[in-house]
């Protein structure tokens, strides 16, 4: 049987895209290399409010809410400054383990009418040299050739579809931090101790260190360490003990660690580049980490995958070359600000005098904290947390109190932010160019018509 769309990869991006397409009557096949209900070794876990909106579209949102406690208010620590940042009213975030989430997404795809096959690994792409026309897949019963009008790579940062099509990468950035995390049975302290009473999750910058604490489904806590790569490289196979020691150096984490022990061996890696890849080509498209992968420190990757699935579905249903190009350019224009924000927040020297002064101001201003919630909800640009006038005023007040070091930090950040803005405008201009060409157009051989939705 041939399909309208073959999706390679059946997790966040792939299963969500399949559910959205199948609900519109598009004949959709999902090929997932792993067994059903296999865990995902590396994942940020965190779903920001816009990502939850997409899960509501496919009927998974309430299932996630039913098993996962919400993160309505987070604590952000910069040395001795604690800022409490609320999410917008009624729009919390959720930290759900992939062993829980992925089956919900895969079930949603199947219930919508998609054909989901597990233990099926794509080894080749079919085509005439000009466009992709299908895949060669290895499954439990051998090799099979399957054709489709569109092949979607939703198979992660090491995407087979991206590799076989040879798409170019751009905006490549190498992280300064590693990431290691464990799950812990939630100790009574988390619920009963007043030290943990006014927040649902925490991110702490102390020295050049970065630590995370969030509540997950199944009454477990996720605690994560993001040390500089140079430090983590020395941990080697002793990462379990070293991660726990690293977490325990913070007085926010130490009391919890004294009352609980990690489940399993934990996960982690020394960091991998963030990047963009060309999102479309003749007969194929990329979605999720296959097309764009950012630094994990800001926890936007899963939401990007869900939003990308919604955007790609729109392009598939419109089914014109311009629609696919718009999908690509919208992805870039809407995510590049958060890409650079992740690069910025992943710096090992972020904890400087300037940033600490900003934290002090956020602590004194509930309005600034609420603005941060709007950034996480993607209703405010990440670098519009403060206006230029507000930033100058904060630094000026610090200077009047004899604090001169923040001036150098402000200048350094201003130079970096100007560079980010300049590059953001490039991708905004490319999107505007697509909009200027948005006139009725006949279908092109670049992407043949899909079947009429049922």
Q: What name fits each language-model region?
A:
Residues 314-454:
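C-terminal helical "tail/cap" subdomain of flavin- and related membrane-associated enzymes
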Residues 142-144, 154-253:
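Conserved FAD-binding catalytic core of PHBH/FMO-like flavoproteins
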Residues 41-75:
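N-terminal FAD cofactor-binding segment of flavoenzymes
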């Amino acid at each position: 049987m041939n399909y309208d769309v073959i999706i390679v990869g059946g997790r966040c991006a792939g299963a969500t895209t399949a559910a959205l397409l199948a609900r519109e009557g598009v004949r959709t096949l999902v090929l997932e290399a792993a067994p059903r209900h296999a865990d995902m070794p590396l994942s940020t876990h965190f779903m920001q409010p816009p990502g939850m909106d997409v899960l509501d579209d496919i009927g998974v949102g309430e299932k996630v809410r039913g098993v996962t406690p919400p993160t309505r208010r987070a604590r952000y620590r910069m040395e001795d400054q604690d800022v409490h940042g609320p999410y917008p009213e009624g729009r919390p975030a959720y930290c759900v383990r992939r062993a829980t989430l992925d089956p919900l997404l895969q079930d949603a795809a199947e219930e919508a009418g998609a054909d989901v096959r597990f233990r099926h690994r794509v080894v080749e792409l079919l085509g005439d040299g000009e466009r992709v026309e299908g895949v060669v897949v290895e499954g439990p019963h051998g090799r099979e050739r399957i054709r489709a009008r569109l092949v979607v790579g939703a198979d992660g940062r090491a995407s087979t579809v991206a590799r076989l099509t040879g798409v170019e990468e751009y905006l490549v950035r190498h992280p300064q931090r590693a990431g290691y995390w464990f799950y812990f049975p939630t100790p009574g302290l988390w619920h009963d101790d007043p030290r943990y009473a006014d927040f649902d999750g925490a991110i702490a910058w102390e020295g050049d260190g970065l630590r995370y604490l969030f509540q997950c489904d199944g009454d477990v806590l996720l605690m994560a360490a993001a040390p500089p790569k140079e430090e983590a490289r020395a941990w080697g196979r002793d990462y379990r003990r070293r991660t726990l020691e690293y977490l325990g150096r913070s007085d926010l984490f130490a009391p919890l660690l004294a009352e609980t022990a990690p489940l399993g061996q934990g996960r982690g890696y020394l960091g991998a580049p963030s990047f963009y890849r060309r999102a479309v080509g003749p007969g194929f498209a990329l979605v999720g980490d296959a097309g764009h992968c950012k630094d994990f420190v800001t926890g936007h990757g899963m939401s990007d995958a869900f939003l990308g699935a919604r955007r790609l579905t729109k392009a598939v249903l419109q089914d014109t070359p311009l629609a696919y190009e718009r999908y690509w350019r919208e992805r870039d224009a809407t995510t590049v600000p958060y890409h650079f924000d992740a690069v910025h927040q992943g710096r090992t020297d972020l904890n400087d005098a300037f940033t600490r002064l900003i934290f002090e101001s956020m602590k004194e201003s509930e309005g600034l904290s609420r603005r941060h919630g709007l950034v996480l909800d993607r209703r405010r640009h990440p670098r519009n947390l403060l206006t230029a006038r507000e930033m100058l005023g904060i630094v000026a007040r610090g200077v009047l109190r004899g604090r001169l070091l923040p001036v150098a930090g402000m200048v350094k950040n201003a130079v970096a932010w100007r560079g980010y803005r300049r590059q953001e405008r490039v991708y905004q201009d490319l999107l505007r160019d697509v909009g200027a060409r948005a006139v009725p157009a006949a279908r092109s051989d670049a992407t043949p018509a899909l079947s009429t939705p049922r």
